[in-house]
Amino acid sequence: MNLKPEEISSIIKQQIKNYENKVELTDTGSVLTVGDGIASVYGLEKAMSGELLEFPGEIYGMALNLEEEVVGAVILGDDSEIKEGDIVKRTGRIVEVPVGEALIGRVVNSLGQPIDGKGPIAYTKTRPVESEAPGIIDRRSVYEPLQTGIKSIDSMIPIGRGQRELIIGDRQTGKTSIVIDTILNQKGKDVICIYVAIGQKRSTIAQLVSSLEKGGALDYTIVVSATASESAPLQYIAPYAGAAMGEEFMYNGKHVLIVYDDLSKQAVAYREMSLLLRRPPGREAYPGDVFYLHSRLLERAAKLSDELGGGSMTALPIIETQAGDVSAYIPTNVISITDGQIYLQPELFYSGVRPAVDPGISVSRVGGSAQIKAMKKVAGTLKLAYSQYRELAAFSQFGSDLDEDTKKRLAQGERIVEILKQGEHQPIKVENQVMIIYAVINNHLEDIPIDNIARFESELYAFVDNNYPEISRKILGGEDFTHDLTDAINEFKEKFVVEV
């Protein structure tokens, strides 16, 4: 092989000419210790709180403890591949998730990555998981109703768009059923729903997704899932990721309903992380800032002013109590942050009153101004009659000889309890709710036996819809409907066949 010196020199000159010296400057650190989803990283002097850190093998972490020489980071994923001495890079970005229309109908994890096997998500925008809540000037008071389709809630504990309403109760009292029914009831109402599952079983989430699919609700719903088998940091970050996805729609003038199921598990995950990061424990071993954990999340739900597009984000956080103890640390924290609570009582649930809403200690602090006129008219009387019945029922257990008035009130109360019962995944239109509540408070059901009431109710809806559709229009339009509805109920009662 004959090599000419001039050829070699021309090749070398060409190489030198084309050489570009690219120097990439990144702030790096090295792993000192790792375990239980927590890494101590030496270096990274300029790291920000909440910054995304890159570990080897495309594993990411989040800087939480910023000390003089060491950064305490939580690992968002599997920490088994990370070892002592590994190089950690700063990304210069706060943890962010994909947002926008592309996520609707999908099931994603806490970082917005798809886990439903339907391929990648074609998103064009991301948002930081932590962002500042709208200020006082940016908000307007809640005035539009958000119908749940559940009679006891829409009448006595109404929810408005932009409200935060806590759902609280022991395990297995129907908390998730209420929020699923609320999501199903948003069909055709131009509301985007986000369901954030924290610390739940995968089988439960699979069941829930199939319920939403059957009801056609997945077309306007995003499911964010951080299951019980995932690390504490992913369970901690899931609600903030869901809120970021919702904010994108809210700031674009749309209406969002977001469910956090449930925040007690998020608090437990945060406690685990904080103790591993050696933060000082407080009451029930929770860190001192556990109130701020939930307040900064729930303050992001708002009804925006018209100048900002008038969008809204309604939050339904769920808290699980132990043996009905609503005065524990986390329940009292969240009760004080939210605009009211729906308390589900195990005794009611087991006695067959489902949904097991206890109107005695349930309250909606701002929802009353969001009720439609017709519902406001009938709901006040209903709540009063129901609470009087509860009092009388407890008292009448001790007395055998009751006067006629007391017997009448007890009979009416029994019928109120009966009409407030509702099957799972069977939301009822607000105009139909008004009809049956009007019937019971005006004693139109006093001669109908208790075991016939459910049938009477469903047949009444069909009768009015088929023969007097204008009544529904009047109820929704805020016109006077009482005479027409009374006549329709009386006509229907004549045709109704009581089954013994």
From Swiss-Prot:
The protein's Enzyme Commission number: 7.1.2.2
Keywords, in A-Z order: ATP synthesis, ATP-binding, Cell membrane, CF(1), Hydrogen ion transport, Ion transport, Membrane, Nucleotide-binding, Translocase, Transport
Recorded superkingdom: Bacteria
Protein localization: Cell membrane
Pfam families on file: ATP-synt_ab, ATP-synt_ab_C, ATP-synt_ab_N
Gene3D superfamilies: 2.40.30.20, ATP synthase alpha/beta chain, C-terminal domain, P-loop containing nucleotide triphosphate hydrolases
Residues reported to bind ATP: G169, D170, R171, Q172, T173, G174, K175, T176
Entry similarity comment: Belongs to the ATPase alpha/beta chains family.
Protein name: ATP synthase subunit alpha
GO molecular function, one term: ATP binding
PROSITE patterns (UniProt xref): ATPASE_ALPHA_BETA
Any GO CC annotation of this UniProt entry: plasma membrane
Its membrane topology: Peripheral membrane protein
Residue(s) at site: Required for activity: S362
Function according to Swiss-Prot or TrEMBL: Produces ATP from ADP in the presence of a proton gradient across the membrane. The alpha chain is a regulatory subunit.
Keyword Cell inner membrane: no
Catalytic activity: ATP + H2O + 4 H(+)(in) = ADP + phosphate + 5 H(+)(out)
Principal subcellular localization: membrane
CDD domains according to UniProt: ATP-synt_F1_alpha_C (cd18113), ATP-synt_F1_alpha_N (cd18116), F1-ATPase_alpha_CD (cd01132)
